[in-house]
């Protein structure tokens, strides 16, 4: 087949080139002829089966050559020693309460004589080699009757959230081992109907949650969309993060982002559920949350290791998934479960960082998307799902991905795959991994790539998600971090590597049933089922496992219970390189507005209005518009619009409000310029330092005034008897080195650790761990003695407040693989230096001649009562700044929106934003989208947006659209202009 529009690269691991051959069967189809003939609500359903693609494979047995039959989606559930006779299953929606029955309406068959059907090897686990398991003929081969007997049966009913279902099984192959007669049913028509008896596992329904409609349509042949009235229409439902107490303070950024992108997310501390935390308590809590009014709990994320939040353990089972199995007594999840397994704050932070970056920061430049890795063992065959070997199985998946649009498929198939093959694939950039083979707690069997190799991964934020079919790769109860945990915690130079999410088993997996689950996961991912489109990792994987349970019954249930999601179950998956969305929104809204309309050129995108991690409304884009209903707005001065879409760049915009005047003055004159590979931001400080420790409002004759009360006119540092020490550096040597300030309050280290006659603090890299012990204070606060320290100031600013007094101090300058220097020129080491109360000592490191040195600036009233926060494209990149300059490294090649916000003790200012556009792209940065004139005492602002004029106390004096005119009384004023969601602030003086 030729495709002139797309080139697909198929790469083979080098170990497979040459010498490899295997028998290639005709690829099996995946669309058996099973169709719905009639459905009258849940009372009567008629279904017809027609045989499709029946094949026979010859195998050697103790009785000679025998036949193993296979057909499309047929599954061998025969016990060991019984004839191998695949069945096929389909799920139906049935009555909520009644017992159901199945009757054969009609059938057609043919018979083959003198056929020896091979005995089943039973359920084979993936820690076994199928070839080494012998064929054993059981007692059934001496019985003169047809097996399995009935050609149509019903399983016990199950409940999937709001629908009761039941599986009808077709057994079209019937075999008499004594007469060696194989009866092949080419067509079977059945009727499934309700009886007058009450059935098992009944459903007491309160209503349906519309977010699962697609799942029902895919799961149940006879499901009728909209036959139930949803209680509440919610696009994404709700997520609860259950977090161990020790990580409660570390989860905020994750929760804020989830709310910002439109998923209502709440936090529950595990120890507040029960102390000690038990699996039963977690299970009961999730059930209670699910049963709350609205019926919208969709995701639960567990944060902590097994010892923090235990898995549910029963004989042969270690399960997180059972926490999501709530309604009925079956193994179908109503809630998607995931886990950030962590043993330290660092473990947790990297999982949070990778998840947020994946959803928020991926751009059209991320060309690694659309590239996939398929890994397979050299085993499997007739007893596996669809009769496929692992290699055949992965080839089916590879073909599916190629048809969907993946541009590169790397195939690593045994024999001979090495860890380097896998490392190279990861480091080259891939977005999806499918693994089918053997496994251990710490490695993949094929390639032997394991936890010891993870440190060699350098795929920083180019993270695939993984569908993993293997034994115990996800056993997080193991004595050391398991394979899945290692991939989720992996870092290189502080940046996430490894994977963004992985589904892996806590126990030994069966050979065949997970293959069916993996097939379905990839089919859902590639949108093969229009009635079951899923965009989250939890949705894709769980729905894939539903197909496994439907076909493999009890074994499928066991596999589902133990197939664990490591990562965020609500993760919005990406498959191909994203494209941009065109989004427009009002520059300003009223706090009293009931809704806001957002235009977007991608239907299905989710648009959300939020502020500081609180969601005020969310809607899906339909016909180019999302109408967001707003609730909960109070006095927010700015709002954030976030729009996410499948395989789209995330769009984040600022929307201003016309609420009460903000007493917290913003920065002004924000600029963005290029210095090498850096974008340098500069701005002017707020006009008045708002010292607002008390912020009250009172009404006088109907005029609302804002009163700012200061505790004292004296600077805080002076009152507390402290001095502020600030260290600032910006890649002085351009080699990754930095600086540390060491402060000795006993002032007895000059001539000891601090040499009096040299600028070498330590002569080599064998640095004692306690070298800095005599120094009571350091900048940064956790400075460590090393030639390559973890904590130093390389590109940025840090400060510490110290009691005023006499100190010895030095500025350490570590050099990798050499020594620890003391910086050269200026006050870089001092004996008995007096730091005065109420003053700020700012050490700015610079290149001076052929060496380095510092400029020391001493100012009164150190410890400003506000700091600056910098945002890039809506994402916070730096906070706690005290300087009016910030350098963003490595960002000069692309356009960005930068915003600066002033954070005061009691509130924050409006953001002021500027567009940075690289040289040669467009010279528009100097063009302000407004004009500002002062004639006499008349201020005139003209723009295509909103304009506001404030006095220096923060009172708004005039506001309007397009043109605002105000007659001033003399003095200083601030003008804010908002155009296309971006804010511009200027100060001016009127004489």
UniProtKB/Swiss-Prot annotation:
Residues bound to Ca(2+) 2: 327, 330, 332, 334
EC number(s) from the headed UniProt entry: 3.4.22.37
Signal peptide per UniProt: 1-24
Active-site residues from the entry: 438, 471
Entry binding sites for Ca(2+) 3: 388, 393, 519
Amino acids binding Ca(2+) 1: 305, 476, 485
GO molecular function: calcium ion binding; calcium-dependent cysteine-type endopeptidase activity
GO cellular component: extracellular region
Pfam families according to UniProt: DUF2436, Peptidase_C25, Peptidase_C25_C, Propeptide_C25
Residues making up the propeptide: 25-227
Disulfide bridge positions per record: none
Stored Gene3D superfamilies: 2.60.40.3800, 3.40.50.1460, Gingipain r, domain 1, Immunoglobulins
Activity regulation comment: Requires cysteine for activation and Ca(2+) and/or Mg(2+) for stabilization. It is stimulated by glycine-containing dipeptides. It is resistant to inhibition by proteinase inhibitors in human plasma.
Catalyzed reactions: Hydrolysis of proteins and small molecule substrates, with a preference for Arg in P1
Subcellular location: Secreted
Entry keywords, A to Z: Calcium, Hydrolase, Metal-binding, Protease, Secreted, Signal, Thiol protease, Virulence, Zymogen
InterPro entries per record: Caspase-like_dom_sf, Gingipain, Gingipain_N, Gingipain_N_sf, Gingipain_propep_sf, Ig-like_fold, Ig_E-set, Pept_C25_gingipain_C
A GO BP entry: proteolysis
Similarity comment: family membership: Belongs to the peptidase C25 family.
Function of the protein: Thiol protease. Acts synergistically with RgpB to catalyze the maturation of fimbrial subunits, such as FimA. Its proteolytic activity is a major factor in both periodontal tissue destruction and in evasion of host defense mechanisms.
Protein name: Gingipain R1
Taxonomic source organism: Porphyromonas gingivalis
Lineage start: Bacteria, Pseudomonadati, Bacteroidota, Bacteroidia, Bacteroidales
Encoding gene (name): rgpA
């Amino acid at each position: 087949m030729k495709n002139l529009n797309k080139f697909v690269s198929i790469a083979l691991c080098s170990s497979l080139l040459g010498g490899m051959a295997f028998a290639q069967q005709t690829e099996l189809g995946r669309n058996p002829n099973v169709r719905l003939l009639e459905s009258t609500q849940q009372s009567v359903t008629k279904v017809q089966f027609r045989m499709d693609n029946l094949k026979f494979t010859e195998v050697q047995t103790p009785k000679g050559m025998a036949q193993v039959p296979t057909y499309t989606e047929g599954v061998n559930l025969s016990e060991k020693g019984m004839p191998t006779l695949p069945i096929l299953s389909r799920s139906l929606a049935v009555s909520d309460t009644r017992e159901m029955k199945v009757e054969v309406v009609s059938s057609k068959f043919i018979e083959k004589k003198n056929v020896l059907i091979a005995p089943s090897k039973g359920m084979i686990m993936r820690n076994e080699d199928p070839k080494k398991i012998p064929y054993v003929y059981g007692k059934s081969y001496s019985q003169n009757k047809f097996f399995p007997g009935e050609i149509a049966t019903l399983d016990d009913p199950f409940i999937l959230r709001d629908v009761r279902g039941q599986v009808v099984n077709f057994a079209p192959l019937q075999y008499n081992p004594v007469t060696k007669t194989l009866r092949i049913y080419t067509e079977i028509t059945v009727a499934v109907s309700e009886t007058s008896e009450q059935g098992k596992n009944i459903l007491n329904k309160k209503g349906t949650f519309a977010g699962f409609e697609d799942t029902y349509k895919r799961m149940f042949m006879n499901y009728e969309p909209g036959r139930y009235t949803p209680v509440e229409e919610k696009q994404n439902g709700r997520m609860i993060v259950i977090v161990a107490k020790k990580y409660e303070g570390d989860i905020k950024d994750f929760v804020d982002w989830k709310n910002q992108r439109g998923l209502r997310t709440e936090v529950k501390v595990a120890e507040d559920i029960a102390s000690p935390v038990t699996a039963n308590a977690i299970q009961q809590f999730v059930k209670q949350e699910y049963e709350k009014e609205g019926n919208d709990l969709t995701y639960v994320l567990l944060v902590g290791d097994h010892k923090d939040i235990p898995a549910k353990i029963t004989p042969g089972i270690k399960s997180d998934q059972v926490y999501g199995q709530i309604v009925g007594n079956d193994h179908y999840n109503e809630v998607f479960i995931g886990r950030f397994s962590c043993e330290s704050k660092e473990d947790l932070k990297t999982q949070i960082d990778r998840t947020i970056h994946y959803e928020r920061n991926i751009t059209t430049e991320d060309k690694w998307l659309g590239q996939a890795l398929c890994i397979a063992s050299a085993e499997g065959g007739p007893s596996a799902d669809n009769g496929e070997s692992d290699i055949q199985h992965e080839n089916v998946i590879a073909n599916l991905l190629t048809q969907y649009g993946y541009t590169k498929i790397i195939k690593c198939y045994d024999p001979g795959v090495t860890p380097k093959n896998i490392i190279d694939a990861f480091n080259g950039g891939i977005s999806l991994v499918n693994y089918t083979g053997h496994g251990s707690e710490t490695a993949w069997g094929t390639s032997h790539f394991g936890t010891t190799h993870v440190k060699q991964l350098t795929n920083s934020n180019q993270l695939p998600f993984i569908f993993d079919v293997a034994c115990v790769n996800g056993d997080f109860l193991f004595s050391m971090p398991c394979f899945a945990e290692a991939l989720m915690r992996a870092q290189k130079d502080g940046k996430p590597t490894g994977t963004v999410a992985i589904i892996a088993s806590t126990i030994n997996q069966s050979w065949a049933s997970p293959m069916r689950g993996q097939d379905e996961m990839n089919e859902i991912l590639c949108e093969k089922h229009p009635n079951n489109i899923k965009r989250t990792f939890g949705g894709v994987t769980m729905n894939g496992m539903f197909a496994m349970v439907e076909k493999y019954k009890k074994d499928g249930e066991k596999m589902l219970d133990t197939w664990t999601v490591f990562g965020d179950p609500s993760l919005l998956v990406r498959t191909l390189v994203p494209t941009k969305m065109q989004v427009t929104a009002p520059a300003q809204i009223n706090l009293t507005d009931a809704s806001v309309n957002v235009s977007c050129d991608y239907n299905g995108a989710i648009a959300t209005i939020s502020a500081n991690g609180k969601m005020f409304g969310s809607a899906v884009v339909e016909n180019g518009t999302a109408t967001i209903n707003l609730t909960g707005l109070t006095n927010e001065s700015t709002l954030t619009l976030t729009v996410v879409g499948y395989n789209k760049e995330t769009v984040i915009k600022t929307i201003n409000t016309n609420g009460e005047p903000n007493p917290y003055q913003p920065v002004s004159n924000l600029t963005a310029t290029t210095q090498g590979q850096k974008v340098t931001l500069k701005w002017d400080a707020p006009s008045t330092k708002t010292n607002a420790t008390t912020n009250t409002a009172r009404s006088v004759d109907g005029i609302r005034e804002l009163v700012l009360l200061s505790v004292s006119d004296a600077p805080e540092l002076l009152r507390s008897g402290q001095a502020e020490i600030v260290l600032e550096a910006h890649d002085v040597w351009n080699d990754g080195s930095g600086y540390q300030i060491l402060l000795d309050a006993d002032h007895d280290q000059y001539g000891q650790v601090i040499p009096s006659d040299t600028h070498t603090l330590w002569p080599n890299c064998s640095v004692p761990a306690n070298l800095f012990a005599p120094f009571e204070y350091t900048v940064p606060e956790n400075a460590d003695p090393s030639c390559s320290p973890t904590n130093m100031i390389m590109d940025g600013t840090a400060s510490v407040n110290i009691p005023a007094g006499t100190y010895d101090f030095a500025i350490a300058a570590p050099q990798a693989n050499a020594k620890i220097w003391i910086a050269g020129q200026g006050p870089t080491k001092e004996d008995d230096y007096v730091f005065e109360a109420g003053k700020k000592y700012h050490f700015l490191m610079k290149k001076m001649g052929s060496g380095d040195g510092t400029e020391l600036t001493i100012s009164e009233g150190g410890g400003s009562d506000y700091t600056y926060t910098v945002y890039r494209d809506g994402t916070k990149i730096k906070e706690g700044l005290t300087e009016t300059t910030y350098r963003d490294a490595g960002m000069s090649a692309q356009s960005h929106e930068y915003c600066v916000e002033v954070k005061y003790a009691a509130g924050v200012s409006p953001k002021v934003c500027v567009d940075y556009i690289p040289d040669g792209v467009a010279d528009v940065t100097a063009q302000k989208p407004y004009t500002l004139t002062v004639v006499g005492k008349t201020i005139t602002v003209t723009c295509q947006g909103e304009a506001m004029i404030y006095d220096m106390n923060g009172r708004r004096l005039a506001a309007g659209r397009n043109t605002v005119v105000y007659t001033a009384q003399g003095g200083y004023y601030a003008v804010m202009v908002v155009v296309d969601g971006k804010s511009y602030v200027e100060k001016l003086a009127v004489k």
